[in-house]
Every structure is written in C-alpha cells, then in structure tokens.
Amino acid sequence: MIRSNGGPSRGRLVWCGLVATAALASEAALAEDHALAARAGLLGLGVEYAHSLGDRWAVRVGWNGSELGFEAEESGIDYDLDLVWDSLAVGVDFHPTGGALRLSAGLLRNDNRVEARGELNDTVTIGGTTYDSDAVGSLFGRVTFDNSAVFAGIGWDWSRRRTRGVGVSLDIGVLSQGSPRVSLRASGPIADVPEFEDDLAAEEAEFEDEIKDLDLLPFATIGVVFRF
C-alpha cells in the first residue's frame, strides 16, 4: 500500500478551491447588494437606500423633503404659498430582464402639503358673501392629503450591472394620495361668527372641487446612484 507522507490530498485541494471560489463570489454579490442614491423630481429632493434580492428583485427605502414658495390668486385673494414635500417611501422593484428596467410599487407615508397666507385689501367675497377685509383679517389655508399613499411606476437603474461605482436612475409613475382636503381660517374679529364659518366652509368645498384631480399625482425623478 502506498501512503502519502505529507501534503494535502486532491479532495482537500478541490474543497479548498470551492470554498475560496464561493467566498469570492459571495464578496462580489455583496458588492452589488447595496446602493445609495440622491434624487430630484416632482416629489422634491430626496435620498434613498436600495438592497438587491437576487437578479430580478430589490427593495428601496427613501425620503423626500424640500420646500418651494410661490404666489397664486384664488377667488380674488392673493396668496403666498409654500409647497412642502415630506414623505417616506418603501417600495419593491421587479427587473423583468434582470437589467436596468424595473417595475416598481410601494407605500408612502405622506405629509406633502400646501400652506397659504392671504392678505386682503378693501373687501373680499367668501362663500358668496362680501366682507370687509378689516373684519376678516388675514386668511390662512392648508391643503393636505391622506397620510398613507400608494405608488406605481416604471424606471431604469443603469447602475445595476456595476459591481460598485456611480450610475444614473430614472423613474416615472403615479402617486395615489386620496382627495385633497382644504382648511381655511381667518385672524379677524368675525372668525368665530357662525355665518362667516359657514361661508368659509363653502369656500373650502369650492377649492377642494377645483383641485380634486390631485388625488392622482404623476411624478418623475432622476437620481445619481452609488453602488457598493
């Protein structure tokens, strides 16, 4: 019988080779598992973390937040408006070809809103009734939506085939956020008069009807992705 007097057996060498190969493959896979992105679009500015679940699936968590001021006129009243983006999103991506193309859906914790302040001159008509501006004072308004919203869309993440480095992403879709709700209040001495409160409620209802189409909000975002 011939015995080996030292050195590893062929089986042990093969096993060690397989373990080393698996370790290298695992390390390469982990390098593709994580990504951070900075995004900008119709939902504001945001940051996002993504984690791949194989070749075709990924999950993403992101936050959008920013503010934009502008002016607008409604029912003869000039308003200073602040459009506030504040949302936290959790979504799932499906890559049907395993490449850049992705189909996305998810949930949004939605605190997007519009805040308004209206300064009145002379007289103003509210709910069909004309009031003196000194009696009404300033008008303050807010437009809000459901706290929970859902979204769906299509996009492309051209960084997906990189092991690490920087790429670009693009997403378009629609956000279902429920019917907009309008609240108005006045700072003047008639603010608590029942008849004025009724007219203010009528003004709120009219404004809600004018912006009812905002329950479905199209969006588009572009991002710079760092994959590691």
Sequence positions of predicted segments:
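N-terminal secretory signal peptides that target proteins for export/translocation
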Residues: 1-11
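Outer-membrane beta-barrel "beta-signal"
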Residues: 93, 215-228
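A membrane-pore/channel beta-structure motif
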Residues: 31-33, 40-42, 52, 66-67, ...
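Transmembrane beta-strands of outer-membrane beta-barrel proteins
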Residues: 34-38, 47, 55, 59-61, ...
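N-terminal signal peptide c-region/cleavage motif recognized by signal peptidases
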Residues: 26-27
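Extracellular/periplasm-exposed beta-strand and loop segments of Gram-negative cell-envelope proteins
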Residues: 63-88, 112-149, 178-217
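Outer-membrane beta-barrel strand-turn architecture
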Residues: 51-55, 96-98, 158-162, 228
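Transmembrane beta-strands of outer-membrane beta-barrel pores
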Residues: 42-44, 63-69, 107-113, 158, ...
